[in-house]
Swiss-Prot record:
Swiss-Prot/TrEMBL catalytic activity: heme b + (2E,6E)-farnesyl diphosphate + H2O = Fe(II)-heme o + diphosphate
Record-level Gene Ontology MF annotations: protoheme IX farnesyltransferase activity
Highest taxon of the lineage: Bacteria
Name recorded for this polypeptide: Protoheme IX farnesyltransferase 1
Keyword vocabulary terms for this entry: Cell inner membrane, Cell membrane, Heme biosynthesis, Membrane, Transferase, Transmembrane, Transmembrane helix
Note, other: Carbon 2 of the heme B porphyrin ring is defined according to the Fischer nomenclature.
InterPro entries assigned to the protein according to its UniProt record, in alphabetical order: Protohaem_IX_farnesylTrfase, UbiA_prenyltransferase, UbiA_prenylTrfase_CS, UbiA_sf
Thylakoid among keywords: no
Family, per entry: Belongs to the UbiA prenyltransferase family. Protoheme IX farnesyltransferase subfamily.
Pfam families recorded: UbiA
Origin species: Pseudomonas putida (strain ATCC 700007 / DSM 6899 / JCM 31910 / BCRC 17059 / LMG 24140 / F1)
Metabolic or biological pathway: Porphyrin-containing compound metabolism; heme O biosynthesis; heme O from protoheme: step 1/1
Upper classification of the organism: Bacteria, Pseudomonadati, Pseudomonadota, Gammaproteobacteria, Pseudomonadales
Membrane topology: Multi-pass membrane protein
Function: Converts heme B (protoheme IX) to heme O by substitution of the vinyl group on carbon 2 of heme B porphyrin ring with a hydroxyethyl farnesyl side group.
Length: 297
């Protein structure tokens, strides 16, 4: 009985792992920010709860499809070889059915508790990641994460539209921030895992163009990100608190990118990658804090 229960727990954990919960949580932080930034009043509990649940379920479904498509690649890479599908703990067909169930439930929640525009934009984001990026771009071009990054940048727009019911310039600016953040984030990881990507025949930029070229582009994109991150203040979407945070966080990110560009230290790339995660989290928290500070004035 104890053995049977441990197997069941492992299966439950395997299916949870397929949804990439840590990635989904970061996405939901940005969708939450989009929701709260969209209004001067409070967000209704139904939109807050079921809107984010729907977005999260669809994101989880897309992540499962990514695991299915990449299972052979994952088996070749040290970072991913222990994933459930790569090790055969979950079969592809049950995983795809699980992905379909997550996506359908997410779409139903969005249609019922938010609005049709949010649901269709979420579906477009899901298909962009699961089909366009995972199925084609990842194996086709070293610009895979630049082109495919738009799908991963959508959550703040989805959260905003869930509350407002329409697309406007402000949420598109939030999308632009994540879009500019994506290349330095993933290319830093790609440098750290260059040999693994080469072994799996994935044309990541460090594999196709070399580390020096990639480091230069990380530096350039970090400069672009710093400039883009100041636009919410420039258009009076945010105030001085956000400006100070964006400058501090952005300059620190630029420092990491410069160190990576100038240094051959083996841990510089993974250090840049880890900082980029904290950067995005802190930047969106700053947006929220500034928003409610402005409302209280």
């Amino acid at each position: 009985m104890a053995t049977l229960l441990s197997v069941r727990r492992a299966r439950w954990r395997d299916y949870l792992e397929l949804t990439k919960p840590k990635v989904v949580v970061l996405m939901l932080i940005t969708s939450l920010a989009g929701m709260f930034l969209a209004t001067r009043a409070g967000v209704s509990w139904s939109v807050l709860l079921f809107g984010n649940l729907g977005i999260g379920l669809c994101a989880g479904g897309a992540a499962v499809v990514n695991h299915v498509v990449d299972r052979r690649i994952d088996a070749l890479m040290a970072r991913t070889h222990k994933r459930p599908l790569a090790q055969g703990r979950v079969e592809p067909l049950p995983a795809l059915l699980f992905a379909l169930a997550l996506a359908l439930l997410g779409m139903v929640l969005l249609l019922v508790f938010t609005n049709a525009l949010t649901a269709w934009l979420t579906l477009a984001s899901l298909l962009g990641y699961a089909v366009l990026y995972t199925g084609f771009l990842k194996r086709a071009t070293p610009q895979n994460i630049v082109i495919g990054g738009l799908a991963g940048a959508a959550p703040p727009l989805l959260g905003w539209v869930a509350v407002s019911g329409h697309v406007s310039a402000e949420p598109l600016l939030l999308v632009l921030i994540i879009f500019a953040w994506t290349p330095p984030h993933f290319w830093a990881l790609a440098i750290h895992r260059k040999e693994e990507y080469a072994k799996a025949d994935i044309p990541m930029l460090p594999v196709t163009h070399g580390e020096r070229y990639t480091k230069l582009h990380i530096l350039l994109y970090t400069l672009i990100l710093l400039a883009v991150s100041l636009l919410p203040y420039a258009i009076h979407m945010s105030g001085p608190l956000y400006l100070a945070c964006a400058l501090g966080l952005g300059l620190r990110f630029l420092h990491w990118a410069w160190v990576l560009y100038r240094s051959s230290r083996p841990h510089a790339a993974i250090g840049t990658f880890k900082y980029s995660i904290g950067y995005l989290f802190a930047l969106f928290i700053a947006l929220l804090l500034d928003h409610y500070l402005l409302l209280s004035l």
